[in-house]
Design a protein with these regions (language model features):
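Short loop/turn microsegments at loop-to-beta-strand junctions
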Residues: 34, 96-97
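Ribokinase/PfkB-type carbohydrate-kinase core domain
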Residues: 1-11, 57, 61, 73-89, ...
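Glycine-rich phosphate/adenosyl-contacting loop at the front of the ribokinase-like
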Residues: 1-61, 68-70, 77, 133, ...
Length: 146
C-alpha cells in the first residue's frame, strides 16, 4: 500500500489574535481572539495529505502532557497515524509550544523547544516507519535515514 511518511517535531501554536501592539515588559494587553492550532512542517504536510485521502504516517515526539494530547487528537481527527519518537518514560513536554501575538503590523513569537538527541537507534526507528513510502518528508537531523 502506498503512503506518505513525514518526520519531524510537532508544534502547538497559541495564537493571540487582534493585539493592538506587543506589550511592554511587565504590561498586560488583552487580545480580541485566541486560538490553539497544530503547527510544524512535518505535521502540516501529514495533515494536508491525509485530508486529500493519502494514507499518511507521521514520526514525531509526543508525551503525556496537555499539548501532546491536543496534537494526538488533531492527528486522529485528520486521519494521520502518528509514530511516537519520544523515549519510553520520558517526562516533560516533547512538542514545541509557540505563543504568537498578532498585531496590525506584524507578529511576535516566543517558543519552547525541548532539545532532543538524534541517535542511531532513533534513525533506525524512523527508517522502519518510513520504509516503503512513495514520498518521505524529513526534518533536518533525520536526513541520514536516506
Amino acid at each position: 500500500m502506498s503512503f506518505l511518511a513525514s518526520v519531524g517535531v510537532t508544534n502547538v501554536d497559541l495564537m493571540y489574535v487582534g493585539m493592538p501592539r506587543v506589550p511592554q515588559e511587565g504590561e498586560e494587553i488583552f487580545s480580541q481572539d485566541f486560538r490553539v492550532l497544530l503547527g510544524g512542517g512535518a505535521p502540516g504536510t501529514a495533515v494536508n495529505a491525509a485530508r486529500l485521502g493519502i494514507p499518511t504516517r507521521l514520526a514525531t515526539y509526543l508525551g503525556s502532557d496537555l499539548f501532546s494530547g491536543f496534537a494526538r487528537a488533531q492527528f486522529e481527527q485528520n486521519g494521520v497515524s502518528p509514530y511516537n519518537l519520544a523515549a519510553e518514560g520520558e517526562t516533560g513536554i516533547p512538542v514545541n509550544v509557540t505563543s504568537a501575538m498578532l498585531t496590525p503590523g506584524d507578529r511576535t513569537f516566543a517558543t519552547y523547544c525541548k532539545p532532543t538527541a538524534i541517535t542511531d537507534e532513533l534513525l533506525e526507528r524512523v527508517y522502519t516507519m518510513s520504509k516503503g513510502a512513495k514520498l518521505v518528508q524529513m526534518q533536518e537531523g533525520f536526513l541520514p535515514v536516506y
